[in-house]
Design a protein with these regions (language model features):
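Glycoside hydrolase catalytic-domain context in secreted enzymes
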Residues: 1-123
Length: 123
């Protein structure tokens, strides 16, 4: 969501609240680890757990916990060799488990996923 996780966390909350108070569902993207645009479908992100949580996830966490975002769009990249949309750790353990996200989770357009695996891991 940006280069500065603290700033992004502070900015995303009022923006989501302003959108959603007008009966429109806000959707944040790209969850998670969308680190580059060029060849983004070929990226296999392998951050440490600390880096994941301190750099890449804070704004998404704020969007869920503080703003109650209704929509979340996944990213094109892989996470340790698995499409980020199909990652049990990202989707089931963190997003839905720890943060309690109950909104819509959708893929970006033309994401190459295994439908069964995606469904089994919360997409």
């Amino acid at each position: 969501m940006g280069e500065d996780p603290i700033l992004a966390s502070k900015l995303v909350v009022p923006q989501i609240k302003a959108i959603q108070e007008n009966d429109v569902a806000a959707t944040v993207k790209h969850f998670a680890l969308n680190t580059q645009e060029l060849n983004r479908t070929g990226v296999n992100a392998k951050p440490t757990e600390r880096t994941l949580r301190e750099v890449y996830l804070p704004a998404f966490e704020a969007a869920v916990k503080e703003a109650g975002v209704l929509g979340m769009m996944g990213s094109y990249n892989q996470y340790f060799g698995t499409n980020a949309n199909q990652s049990k750790h990202l989707v089931m353990d963190i997003l839905k488990g720890e943060w309690g996200y109950q909104g819509v989770l959708l893929t970006d357009w033309n994401v190459d996923i295994n439908t069964f695996d995606a469904a089994m891991h919360g997409l």
